[in-house]
Amino acid sequence: MALQFTLNQDAPASAAVDCIVVGAFADKTLSPAAQALDSASQGRLTALLARGDVAGKTGSTTLLHDLPGVAAPRVLVVGLGDAGKFGVAPYLKAIGDATRALKTGAVGTALLTLTELTVKARDAAWNIRQAVTVSDHAAYRYTATLGKKKVDETGLTTLAIAGDDARALAVGVATAEGVEFARELGNLPPNYCTPAYLADTAAAFAGKFPGAEAEILDEAQMEALGMGSLLSVARGSANRPRLIVLKWNGGGDARPYVLVGKGITFDTGGVNLKTQGGIEEMKYDMCGGATVIGTFVATVKAELPINLVVVVPAVENAIDGNAYRPSDVITSMSGKTIEVGNTDAEGRLILCDALTYAERFNPEALVDVATLTGACMVALGHQTAGLMSKHDDLANELLAAGEHVFDRAWRLPLWDEYQGLLDSTFADVYNIGGRWGGAITAGCFLSRFTENQRWAHLDIAGVASDEGKRGMATGRPVGLLTQWLLDRAA
């Protein structure tokens, strides 16, 4: 965790912390805690707002020192924007802005009072949970491979949250831990995070908690199961594949929810080699796997009363003389044959075998998560994941969960009219569907291996990582998936 969290019900003026975080709206209205500090300081905040030294506009942060009548040596005033438009997005932005303002510097402990604000259509528990997940996300620092590079160890370490809901805090912390677990895996370079490393890390976590268990299948076991599609992708790499299976037994005899995550630890594109301008970010092609493992972490930490199974096919798509080729015909675990039109459409080839494997758990619902297509990113950008399902009830559950925590998805069609684009003369199905509608035809391909399941597909290509060389893994959509499971456990 980037931060440690506690609950605090002290009066803001007397709280024993390095900094109190309060809010101000653009019309100079103060948040309740800010009003209390204004009263304790005999109108100091009101005076500063009146003369323009403190602003309430969105994105502004002003650090004040030594307010009279206030025990904390610092007060951070965060701009909340237009009071009439204040809602989910401005609330989450304000939390992130506050955390980033205190991330480095002399403030080690702070009291966040923004949780007392009224957020339309949300309750106090939501305020606390989201404050934890957003602030921890903003405070995250990647250090695993920095070597001798100096890391600034100063800055915020402990955040007290105004409120008294211990369960909301615990769920928020569990979700934040899951997000950070996923981000750390996603950010590791591919010479560190190999299929074996990914499997070992997931198994090590599961081994620490009663009710959690892990099974790691090696190449020989996958061969015995007939996973010819997955193993074809793995053929060109010295880093041999693993199938990661994690189980959380929190729901008695109930049928499990099953999450399948694409775990391509590096994607060269294979014989259809990727070009500069994209290949250097292909360590993030395992973020679907990282996300479902992170959701498993959140579920276990929150001790949700459900059964959950996570399946991650962990594979590197590399090139040598044994690598699979365009025009190869391979046989999947389902028995369906697949003509390879492009070796860079490998994610669906490992997922189809993992989805077939997942059927043995008799899922209540089956959801796969994958950085599957650039086409989804072209269609939807970096703001939302793409969602495909033939099951309206499941799709609506996932959409509602994402909307609730602002980790959103947008539904794309999965109509039968697209299926003909996958026809092959030489096999049961072609692994690409042509130039147009690439995200949808990828979903159609997967649908052929989930015909007997209540299934949905999340294409997270646009949301799994930030854009550019300074970007990092985001941990999305751990928030969406964890909320969906929380809703199922309610």
UniProtKB/Swiss-Prot annotation:
Q: Where does Mn(2+) 2 bind?
A: K262, D267, D285, E346
Q: Which Pfam families match?
A: Peptidase_M17 (PF00883), Peptidase_M17_N (PF02789)
Report the Gene3D superfamilies cross-referenced here: Leucine Aminopeptidase, subunit E, domain 1 (3.40.220.10), Zn peptidases (3.40.630.10)
Enumerate the Gene Ontology biological process terms. proteolysis
Listed under catalytic activity are:
Release of an N-terminal amino acid, Xaa-|-Yaa-, in which Xaa is preferably Leu, but may be other amino acids including Pro although not Arg or Lys, and Yaa may be Pro. Amino acid amides and methyl esters are also readily hydrolyzed, but rates on arylamides are exceedingly low; Release of an N-terminal amino acid, preferentially leucine, but not glutamic or aspartic acids
HAMAP family associated with the record: Cytosol_peptidase_M17
Protein's UniProt name? Probable cytosol aminopeptidase
Organism this protein belongs to: Xanthomonas oryzae pv. oryzae (strain KACC10331 / KXO85)
Query: Which gene name belongs to this protein?
Result: pepA
